[in-house]
Each structure stands twice: as C-alpha cells, then as structure tokens.
Amino acid sequence: RVEPIGAITLGRAGKNLTEMAELVEAGCIAFSDDGSPVSDPAVMRNALAYAAMLGVPIMSHCEDLTLSRGWAMHEGAISTRLGLPGYPAAAEEVQIARDIALAEMTGAHIHICHVSTAGGVALVRAAKERGVRVTAEATPHHLTLTDRWVLGSLGEPVAPREPPAPPTRGKRKRKHEPELGLPAWLVPTRLPPYDTSTRVSPPLRSDEDVDALIEGLRDGTIDAIATDHAPHSHVDKECEYGLAAPGI
C-alpha cells in the first residue's frame, strides 16, 4: 500500500507553502519537506495551522542548519579523533523543541521524522505527557549502529554474540563492551575507516542515544520504525567522506 505525502513548501525550499488543500483533495495524507528542514518558524507555524484545519499531520525533518553546517558525522570524541566536522545533537533537538511548541500552539499533529538523539526522545516523551499531538519515528540504523562504525577497522573488533532476549519484566540493563561502548551483541564489521556507507542524515549517534531510542520504542515514545530509505549511486558514495551523499 502506497500513500502520497505532499511537500510543505514549494520546491522544499522552506519559503512558500504549497497548495495544501488541493493536495489533500488529490489524495495526500500528510505533508513533509523531509530531507530539508522548514527553517523559518513563521512558515512552519502557518503550515501547522493549515494542516490542523485539513486534519492531516506535518512530518518534520528537524535540523538547525546553522548548527549542522558543513557536518560529516555526529559531533563527539569519534569525530574529533577522525578530524571530521560534527553535527551536534543540539542541531536536532532545538528544532524538535521548536516544532513541538508550534504544534502545541496550533493544535496540529506534528510527526518527528528519524529521531536520533536521547534529548529528542526526551522532548517527545515530555510533549506526549502534556497532551501535545506529537508522534515520532526512528530508523533501523539509528536503533542499531553508533558513530563508532565510522571508525571501521580502527576500532577494536570483538566476537559477535547473540542478541539478548526481550525483557520479561521491568527495565533491562544492557551490557556493553567496554572497548567499543556498543551493545555486546552488536559490533562493528571490518569496514575501512571513513567508509561512506556509514554516512547518513541525521548521523549515527552515540551509544547513549541508541539506548534512549530503544527505551523510547519500548515505552511508546517512538511510535514507528521507518527506513528513511535514501538510495544513492556509487558515484555519490565513492568520494571523500564529508562529500558523500548521506543515506542508506
């Protein structure tokens, strides 16, 4: 089953709204500029207000471009070690906070695409608790991989193990490999360092972020797992790490 999602703004440029009512009449079930954020808060406010009247959600790619400008991977110890410019968690979180506030103001349904940070999960959880119409998704790669995968063979490999069984009751404490900071059942492959297959948007985050996403999925803060499918040609990937097209 395939359902169309219309663009929020013309050309996904973040400036002028599309003819949302006509697109809903034509069959669109939601609106998104996914891949590009709606940076202007006034434009997003208007989009949410119209969407509320039309009874459809806005799906938001949350990224503050002034904070993520020039990024190659998640900002942290690994990016420093590899000499790559970072995309801080705050670049996602400040826009999640903004869009939740605007959804609360307008009464609209906001859907946060590809949440990747612990702070983002916390913001969505708090908004749900106070009754904001917010839903969220996470991707398989953000639920299972960390920024250590960018290290590839520079990291310390350990023997793979079977994934843990689901918890029977209460919160399960996850065991980590101290050398890698990864779940014991998930370890990096022998990828070369700077392998561009690990460059995605938003970037692979820290182990703490993965833990928070999994906990959010378990407690209902994260409503869905979405692929965020972004296929690219070999030409787009076989280049310098920071210039490679992000996506899996």
At which residue positions do the language-model features occur?
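Metal-cofactor-binding active-site regions of metalloenzymes
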Residues: 1-15
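Histidine/acidic residue-rich metal-binding segments in metalloenzymes
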Residues: 15-225
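Gly/Ser/Thr-rich helix-start
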Residues: 84, 231, 248
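Gly/Ser/Thr-rich active-site loops/lids in small-molecule metabolic enzymes
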Residues: 92, 243-248
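Active-site anion/phosphate-binding pocket segments in diverse small-molecule metabolic enzymes
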Residues: 227-235
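Basic, amphipathic juxtamembrane/active-site segments
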Residues: 234-243
